[in-house]
Amino acid sequence: MAQTDQTSPTRVPAEQAAAPALRRGVGRDAVVGGICGTVVVLMVGASYAAVPFYNWFCRATGFNGTTQVATSAPTSAPLARRIAVRFDTNVAGGLPWKFEAEKTEIEVAIGEVVTVYYTVTNQSARTTMAQAAYNVTPLTSGVYFQKINCFCFTEQTMAPGETREMPVVFYVDPAITADHENDSLKTITLSYTFYPVREAPKPVAAGEPDKPRGNL
């Protein structure tokens, strides 16, 4: 008579049975973590890229009253139509500068190249650095306000107590006369605000005697 196999089935320890599931869970966590890390890096990169892109977009379109940068003067003669240009000056809090336009308002012919001057004084006892942000109002005129030269293109470093005269060369593009949205425009206001950039580097001390080294 054949004997029945009474051998009990082999039991796998619980730790071994759980190991594959645990490894799968760890793998999923690693993938999710990697995806999240990549998203964070992309978001940070996008935030930095957005600043220069926004500045380029404003310059290209005149959006938000941003003026344009001209490489040369217009080739045609100025038009008979004239327009007033007002100059608004501001200094951000914490920047010890005095900033004024030599004239608060002038009248120019459309297409006429004009040079105006601003005076800036560093009223502190330390060297400071700043750069001017700018726009024009009404905002629709920004695309037609062309600057050939401006102190706002670069950072400005002022020594303690220094006063400097800063020119701006500009013209109002004759193309504004074809924009019927500006048919009734009588005045453009050019606004500047100086913002501190960072602490200027301290000059290396000159003429200081060498400190003694070791025992005499």
Curated annotation (Swiss-Prot):
Keyword hit for Transmembrane: yes
Disulfide-linked positions: none
Record membrane topology: Single-pass type II membrane protein
Key word Membrane present: yes
Topological domain spans for side Periplasmic: 51-216
GO cellular component, one term: plasma membrane
Top-rank lineage group of the source organism: Bacteria
Pfam families for this protein: CtaG_Cox11 (PF04442)
Transmembrane segments: 28-50
Membrane side Cytoplasmic: residue ranges: 1-27
GO MF term list: copper ion binding
Subcellular location: Cell inner membrane
InterPro entries xrefs: CtaG/Cox11_dom_sf (IPR023471), Cyt_c_oxidase_assmbl_CtaG (IPR007533)
Function: Exerts its effect at some terminal stage of cytochrome c oxidase synthesis, probably by being involved in the insertion of the copper B into subunit I.
The protein's name in its UniProt record: Cytochrome c oxidase assembly protein CtaG
Gene expressing this chain: ctaG
